[in-house]
């Protein structure tokens, strides 16, 4: 096979709608270019700098066909590795190289990887409201659209300190009463189960805001409601507690969106401490490591449910779709509603139909990036507070 020489690497940090997105474009001497997702919305300019200043000079003139070797070179080039900024930068290039290879082969990515493992991947969406009546309205809307898996949440991950008993002059920010959260959420599960029966299966995201003993109590109490999975019940640095949790509860556990380093998941998967791996593909370095992780999980009976939040580019969404169509142990795909500006910048974005994502048939990843449209939406950064929830006494909760 004749070499496909990398002639340029470009990065784009944009904010077409609510979130900052980072996209990488790799150009070649054959006139074929590829796209990749490097989105890390909390540090977009840091990721862009790594792509532009460090990875671009490293890759110029290399053969784009050599994906595995290029990934290994990018991973070890800085010596210190497996951090979210570098991993996301690597991901953008890695995805773009797979996109190029698919176009050269005139095959969609899922076919390049080995073909379909299923006709379509089930999708789940998010029903979020401040009260049960509004939540029922959201659920009804999604049921009518064909969804049979719905993540149900009452409120956001925190509240106003004026609503809680706090010390005088509390620190400003988002507050979270763990006991109240557990009681309210269990009542929500019961109410939804009573109203809808088995019309759909619930999912729920704790977002790591419980202490280990609370997590065990909560997982046990959730058993009667037969959740599809309970997500991120503990932060990664408390994952060893999952051994005790698994011994006391049959509620399916999903985790992984904060993982960067293989050492964070190897023991969890090997010891079957989770049911679903929720890794964020760009956060672990792209398609190349995602395939290795998925195959490792498959051997251990752990299913895949890639993290697909609203702060992911349509390129990342498309990659998840291709992976989920191909991988034997893919279980479900999170879905997001793409706003109008985002759709104008990224043409060909996958959309669920009747509660499923179907195969994308264009060669490569299948997304077109409109650089002129993107130029109208420069990146805008501001500090985010939602990661900084506090208990009523003011203690910061580790997500």
Curated annotation (Swiss-Prot):
Residues noted as binding D-arabinonate in the record, renumbered to the chain: 207, 257, 278, 307, 334
Record GO biological process: amino acid catabolic process
Key word Metal-binding present: yes
Organism: Enterococcus gallinarum (strain EG2)
Listed SUPFAM superfamilies: Enolase C-terminal domain-like, Enolase N-terminal domain-like
Protein's name in the database: D-galactonate dehydratase family member EGBG_01401
Cited PANTHER family: D-GALACTONATE DEHYDRATASE-RELATED (PTHR48080), STARVATION-SENSING PROTEIN RSPA (PTHR48080:SF6)
Membership in a protein family: Belongs to the mandelate racemase/muconate lactonizing enzyme family. GalD subfamily.
Role summary: Has no detectable activity with D-mannonate and with a panel of 70 other acid sugars (in vitro), in spite of the conservation of the residues that are expected to be important for catalytic activity and cofactor binding. May have evolved a divergent function.
UniProt superkingdom: Bacteria
Gene3D superfamilies named in the record: Enolase-like C-terminal domain, Enolase-like, N-terminal domain
Pfam families referenced in this protein's UniProt entry, alphabetically: MR_MLE_C, MR_MLE_N
Keyword vocabulary terms for this entry: Magnesium, Metal-binding
């Amino acid at each position: 096979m004749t070499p496909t020489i990398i002639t340029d690497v470009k990065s784009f940090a944009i904010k077409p709608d609510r979130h900052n997105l980072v996209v990488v474009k790799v150009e070649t001497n054959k006139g074929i270019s590829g796209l990749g997702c490097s989105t890390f919305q909390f540090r977009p300019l840091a990721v862009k700098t790594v792509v532009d200043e460090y990875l671009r000079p490293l890759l110029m003139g290399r053969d784009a066909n050599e994906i595995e070797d290029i990934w290994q070179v990018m991973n070890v080039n800085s010596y210190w590795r497996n951090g979210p900024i570098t991993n996301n930068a690597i991901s953008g290039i890695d995805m773009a190289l797979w996109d190029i290879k698919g176009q050269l082969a005139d095959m969609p990515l899922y076919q390049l990887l080995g073909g379909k493992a299923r006709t379509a991947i089930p999708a789940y969406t998010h029903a979020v409201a401040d009260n049960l009546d509004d939540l029922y309205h959201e659920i009804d809307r999604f049921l009518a659209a064909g969804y049979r898996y719905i993540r149900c949440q009452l409120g956001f991950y925190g509240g106003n300190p004026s609503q809680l008993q706090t010390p005088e002059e509390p620190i400003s920010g988002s507050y979270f009463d763990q006991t109240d959260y557990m009681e309210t959420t269990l009542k929500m599960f019961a109410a939804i189960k009573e109203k809808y029966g088995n019309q759909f299966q619930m999912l729920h995201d704790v977002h790591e805001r419980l202490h280990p003993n609370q997590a065990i109590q909560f997982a046990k109490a959730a058993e009667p409601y037969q959740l599809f999975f309970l997500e991120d019940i503990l932060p990664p640095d408390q994952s060893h507690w999952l051994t005790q949790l698994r011994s006391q509860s049959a509620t399916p556990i999903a985790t992984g969106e904060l993982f960067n380093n293989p050492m964070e998941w190897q023991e969890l998967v090997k010891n079957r401490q989770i049911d679903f791996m929720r890794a964020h593909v760009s956060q672990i370095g792209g398609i190349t490591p995602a395939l290795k992780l998925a195959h490792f999980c498959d051997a251990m009976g752990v299913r895949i449910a890639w993290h697909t939040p609203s702060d992911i580019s349509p390129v990342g969404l498309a990659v998840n779709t291709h992976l989920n169509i191909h991988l034997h142990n893919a279980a479900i795909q999170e879905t997001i509603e793409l706003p109008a500006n985002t759709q104008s910048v990224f043409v060909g974005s996958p959309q669920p139909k009747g509660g499923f994502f179907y195969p994308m048939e264009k060669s490569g990843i299948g997304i077109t990036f409109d650089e002129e449209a993107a130029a109208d939406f420069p990146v805008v950064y501001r500090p985010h507070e939602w990661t900084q929830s506090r208990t009523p006494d003011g203690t910061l909760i580790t997500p």
